[in-house]
Amino acid sequence: MPKIIIHTNIKDADISTDFEEKVALKVSETINYPLELIHVSVTCGDRMIHNGSRAPMAFVDIDTANKFSEDANPGYTVKFQEFFTKALNIPASRLILHYHATKGSDYGVSRQPPEYKHAEYYV
């Protein structure tokens, strides 16, 4: 169950209204998880500083089970950097991606058919 938490100092009005859906789709395609399992939360207008600058930036935390590794992460980074820099109109130097490897048992969720189809992903 991938969980993506995005903090940015970009104003809500400057981010597309379907940004969360686009993030969920990109994560689904990139790490090969069903779209129905992906949670996205975006906090806009945060007070943020990075490298001494308050220029537009984003900090993206991505938690998921059984996908992140030292070998896989660089490939994910290339895809996520391309996506987020275009979607948020920021340079790669203003984007921080933080991968968190978790276990399925780290999530407390209740998922039942027919709404949730991929039982193999649930504890």
Stretches found by the model and what they are:
Residues 1-123:
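Interaction-mediating elements
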